[in-house]
Curated annotation (Swiss-Prot):
This is Probable alpha-L-glutamate ligase. Mn(2+) 2 binds at E260, N262. Residues 104-287 form the ATP-grasp domain. Its EC number is 6.3.2.-. Belongs to the RimK family. Mn(2+) 1 binds at D248, E260. One of its GO terms (molecular function) is ribosomal S6-glutamic acid ligase activity. Mg(2+) 1 binds at D248, E260. Mg(2+) 2 binds at E260, N262. It comes from Stutzerimonas stutzeri (strain A1501) (Pseudomonas stutzeri). The keyword Nucleotide-binding applies.
Length: 301
């Protein structure tokens, strides 16, 4: 197969591993800088150009699209889909999961367990919003944030009111979530490929911190997940329409709660912690399931 990897940086661990795994299995793998690919949209034959030449002959595309380039990255991926190239994750599914609010609404509609979450526009509604999520302590999240940036834990209702007001004053869209104390600053990252959880790790926040992101100094360890957690992760990825996803789950007193479904999960933490060849399993998934013109939405999304 000829596989394109959409990535801003060929030196990133995840990108390097996908190239290695693809080449080891006899495929040609080309890394394409997402922002340097440009499109001829209004032609009978949809084209993508890169450094002055059309990109042609690809069988599959692996999108590693950073949150900051979601809009442009999805447009490039859609163009590949219109050419009949098989995407590891579809543009529609990526856009869906990147909109945190929409993602939670879809998960909620399908009965997937979530922390109680509130969303409001007017400062007048702040007191009721806080009551809605069972009061303080509570977590405030900026909708555009990644890697734990723009996430605040408010210990008191007074602090919560001040922080929510400040964000609203800055015209920042935020959501307010109940704080799951019993999770103890830990979450579980389930790595879903197809309809299986192929690897899982526990991420523990460093002392004095509540965000367990590895980018924020959290530590990772092996964990055995329960059948219910496994089912929840697989369902969450399915609701989003993602073939490959990192599903972040909290252990609460009333079962597993999904915090986020990540469409471009990093491979470094999960491979180092579990010792599994996650990149190889992703390439195997493409070999089994890839093929021309198999995009469910046919790039119309």
């Amino acid at each position: 197969m000829k596989i394109a990897v959409l990535s801003r940086n060929p030196r990133l661990y995840s990108t390097r591993r996908l190239v290695e795994a693809g080449e080891q299995r006899g495929h040609e793998v080309v890394v394409i800088d997402t922002l340097r690919a440009y499109m001829n949209i209004a032609s009978h034959k949809p084209q993508i150009h890169y450094r002055g030449k059309p990109l042609e002959g690809f069988d599959a595309v692996i999108p590693r699209i950073g949150a900051s380039v979601t809009f442009y990255g999805c447009a490039v991926l859609r163009q590949f889909e219109m050419q009949g190239v098989f995407p590891l994750n579809e543009s529609v599914a990526i856009a869906r999961s990147r909109d945190k609010l929409r993602a939670l609404q879809l998960l909620s509609r399908r009965g997937v367990g979530l922390p109680v979450t509130g969303f409001a526009h007017s400062p007048d509604d702040i007191p009721d919003l806080i009551r809605m999520v069972n009061g303080a302590p509570l977590v405030i999240k900026v909708l555009e944030g990644t890697q734990g940036i723009g996430v605040v834990l408010c210990e008191t209702e007074k602090a919560a009111e001040s922080v929510i007001e400040a964000f609203m004053g800055l015209k920042q869209d935020i959501m307010v979530q109940e704080y799951i104390k019993e999770a103890g600053g830990a979450d579980i990252r389930c790595f879903v490929v197809g309809d299986k959880v192929i690897a899982a790790m526990k991420r523990q926040a460093k002392p004095g911190e509540f965000r367990s992101n590895l980018h924020r100094g959290g530590s990772a360890s092996l964990i055995k997940i329960t059948p219910e957690e496994r089912m929840t992760a697989i369902r969450a990825a399915k609701v989003m329409g993602l073939n490959v996803a990192g599903v972040d789950i909290l252990r609460s007193n009333h079962g597993p709660l999904v915090m986020e479904v990540n469409s471009s999960p990093g491979l470094a933490g999960i491979e180092e912690t579990t010792g599994k060849d996650v990149a190889g399993l992703i390439i195997q998934y493409l070999e089994k399931n890839g093929g021309p013109h198999l995009t469910r939405t046919k790039g119309k999304g």
